[in-house]
Amino acid sequence: MSDDWKIRFGTAGTSDSFAAQGYKTSLEVPEYTAKMGLNAFEYQCGRGVRLGLDKAAKMAAFSAPKDILFSVHAPYYISMSSLEEDKRLNSIQYLLQSAAVCRALGGKRIIFHSGSCGKQSRE
């Protein structure tokens, strides 16, 4: 089966067990994920993209031998349908930042919520 279609299982972020098992930094995420027998990890940027590209590249290097594939969850405050132009433009930047981190992680997927239509009509 092609790696593009390989079924993967992983977590979305780390749980309390990450620290309880003695892990301290995101560079240890690949080891933590592999130890659980998983082969995917969704890096959470729900409150902002705070992972540097250099660190993301190191995480990718550590995950490759373990066959762990990353995805990225973009910030929750994205609102592509906001009536305010600055919010829409900022949302585009958040998506681009998420894409850059995903690429550095060697990931292929970005998860995001586009926002509701708010006060606009759906028509």
Task: Mark where each language-model region is.
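N-terminal pre-domain/capping segments
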Residues: 1-97
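Active-site acidic/histidine proton-transfer and metal-coordination neighborhood
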Residues: 81-123
